[in-house]
């Protein structure tokens, strides 16, 4: 069986930086309260007229700046987002047009914060099944445009940004090993954005605005991050000691700390960037992956574990041996290591 993995990566975050003090002063919150409870110091908000397709295209352009051939033979685009430009056409199709991909398949995937890992799994399956050769996968959001800016439970947590990856064939010994995907709709009312159907609690619906029960989400997240990650490792014949880098969904530092304790993986092996970007939903994992590769922490031959959770309630985990053999897959100073035979 062919080895399928990531062959190129890119990212983009909007220029506007929104610091905690903007919320704390406006909401009458004590200085330092947001960071102490979430680990978030700042986040990025998109400009007026800047939507998911635009930040997606800019992430792809960043990738192309480092690897001009990254989109060669890409024949499918999947965009994981819960803040699309429109119900249709798909935001994936809009991105394809903006980056010069014509005649390719394109669709959006909505699994909230779990979306990017879900999309990686789908891309791998479609390549192995012969339906695609190379797949451009994006995970990104412009949640600032959907937030109730007076809601303490959500407004302070979310930010905007997009990461992208090309999925294709990689040398033997590298790439994706196993995936775990799951969802439980019984927990749906704990985290949702209502749209067409009035099926969530009466009196609490604000159409198009994220609504969250933080206490329930915390308990769920700690459990499923630990369980799904352990399942993925077991499917791959690995243990937590084999993991070089854990890349978790960047929702809340307390969730991450509790999950790493459940894993037995130290925080020193955990990629964290929520302090600067907040929760970008489907964008958190590709943004964290990109930064850790770009600064030289993640290098070729290292074992990665990605774990995510989101609305649905949903969850996903992925084990992967990082390749690092193309320009955007390693830092300028880092050289990819060989995988032992």
Swiss-Prot record:
GO terms for cellular component: cytoplasm. The last Arg residue of the ACP-binding site is essential for the weak association between ACP/AcpP and FabH. PANTHER family: 3-OXOACYL-[ACYL-CARRIER-PROTEIN] SYNTHASE 3, BETA-KETOACYL-[ACYL-CARRIER-PROTEIN] SYNTHASE III. This is Beta-ketoacyl-[acyl-carrier-protein] synthase III 1. It is found in: Cytoplasm. Belongs to the thiolase-like superfamily. FabH family. One of its GO terms (molecular function) is beta-ketoacyl-acyl-carrier-protein synthase III activity. SUPFAM superfamilies: Thiolase-like. The active site is at residues 113, 249, 279. Catalyzes the condensation reaction of fatty acid synthesis by the addition to an acyl acceptor of two carbons from malonyl-ACP. Catalyzes the first condensation reaction which initiates fatty acid synthesis and may therefore play a role in governing the total rate of fatty acid production. Possesses both acetoacetyl-ACP synthase and acetyl transacylase activities. Its substrate specificity determines the biosynthesis of branched-chain and/or straight-chain of fatty acids. Homodimer. Gene3D superfamilies: 3.40.47.10. Keywords: Acyltransferase, Cytoplasm, Fatty acid biosynthesis, Fatty acid metabolism, Lipid biosynthesis, Lipid metabolism, Multifunctional enzyme, Transferase.
């Amino acid at each position: 069986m062919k080895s399928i993995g990531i062959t190129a990566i890119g990212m983009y975050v909007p220029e506007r930086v929104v610091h905690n003090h903007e919320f704390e002063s406006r909401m009458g919150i004590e200085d330092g309260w947001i960071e102490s409870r979430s680990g978030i110091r700042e986040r990025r908000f998109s400009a007026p007229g800047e939507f998911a397709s635009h930040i997606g295209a800019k992430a792809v352009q960043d990738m192309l700046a480092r690897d001009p051939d990254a989109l060669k033979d890409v024949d499918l685009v999947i965009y994981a987002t819960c803040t699309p430009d429109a119900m249709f056409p798909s935001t994936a199709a809009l991105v394809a047009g903006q980056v010069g991909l014509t005649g390719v398949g394109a669709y959006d995937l909505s699994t909230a914060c779990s979306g990017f890992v879900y999309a990686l799994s789908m891309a791998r399956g479609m390549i192995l099944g012969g339906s695609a050769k190379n797949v451009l996968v994006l995970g990104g959001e412009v949640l600032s445009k959907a937030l109730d800016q007076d809601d303490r439970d959500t407004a302070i947590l979310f930010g905007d940004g997009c990461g992208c990856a090309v999925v294709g064939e990689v040398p033997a010994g590298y790439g994706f090993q196993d995936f775990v995907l799951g969802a439980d709709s019984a927990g749906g009312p704990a985290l949702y954005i209502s749209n067409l159907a009035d099926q969530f609690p009466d009196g609490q619906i604000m159409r198009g605005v994220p609504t969250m029960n933080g206490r329930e989400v915390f308990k769920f997240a700690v459990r499923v991050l630990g369980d799904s990650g352990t399942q993925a490792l077991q499917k791959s014949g690995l243990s937590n000691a084999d993991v070089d880098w854990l890349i978790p969904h960047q929702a809340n530092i307390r969730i991450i700390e509790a999950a790493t304790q459940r894993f037995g993986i130290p925080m020193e092996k955990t990629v964290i960037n929520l302090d600067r970007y907040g929760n970008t939903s489907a964008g958190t994992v590709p943004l964290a992956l990109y930064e850790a590769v770009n600064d030289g922490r993640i290098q070729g031959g290292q074992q990665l574990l990605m774990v995510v959770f989101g609305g649905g309630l949903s969850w996903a985990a992925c084990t992967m041996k990082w390749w690092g053999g193309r320009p955007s897959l390693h830092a300028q100073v880092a050289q990819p290591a060989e995988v032992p035979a």
